[in-house]
């Protein structure tokens, strides 16, 4: 992977880790700065999960559509049920309270153990972390975990 891509992604991780007053003094991703992660340049079709790291950030081809990336990630999630794959398409911008959460440049697939992610989300649900999220975006991001955490957050989202 070229150094420019690596630096950009490291900067994005730094942005995800920043404490944000507009998010109740939470970071976009409160666990990002302490996670044991690696950044890997890989073809989308060649991704193979492993648990050597908390998170593996796969940088995949630039020339694929958002829908193709999301469909591939859905396939990975079905084929590797112990892992959670999350797509971040370079041209798709996502926000929480006006703060960009997506990297905005490269096509990425984040991979981590599903049970660890679910546990982290349960812990966050016991705080006011999710109070700042739009309900539709929250459901989109949490997917199956929405049902797991909604018991803690549903009253605030009404």
Give a label for each model feature:
Residues 1-158:
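Expand to "…catalyze enediolate/carbanion chemistry for C-C bond making/breaking, isomerization
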């Amino acid at each position: 992977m070229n150094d420019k891509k690596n630096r950009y992604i490291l900067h994005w991780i730094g942005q995800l880790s920043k404490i944000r007053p507009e998010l109740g003094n939470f970071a976009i991703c409160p666990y990002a700065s302490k996670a044991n992660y690696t950044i890997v340049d890989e073809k989308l079709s060649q991704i193979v999960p492993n648990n050597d790291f908390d998170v593996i950030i796969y940088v995949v081809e630039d020339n694929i559509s958002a829908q193709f990336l999301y469909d591939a990630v859905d396939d990975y999630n079905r084929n590797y049920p112990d892992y959670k794959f999350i797509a971040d398409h370079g041209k798709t911008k996502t926000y929480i309270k006006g703060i960009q959460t997506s990297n905005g440049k490269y096509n990425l697939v984040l991979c981590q153990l599903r049970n660890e992610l679910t546990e982290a989300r349960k812990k966050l649900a016991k705080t006011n972390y999710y109070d700042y999220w739009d309900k539709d975006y929250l459901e989109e991001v949490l997917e199956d975990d929405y049902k797991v955490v909604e018991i803690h957050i549903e009253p605030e989202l009404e």
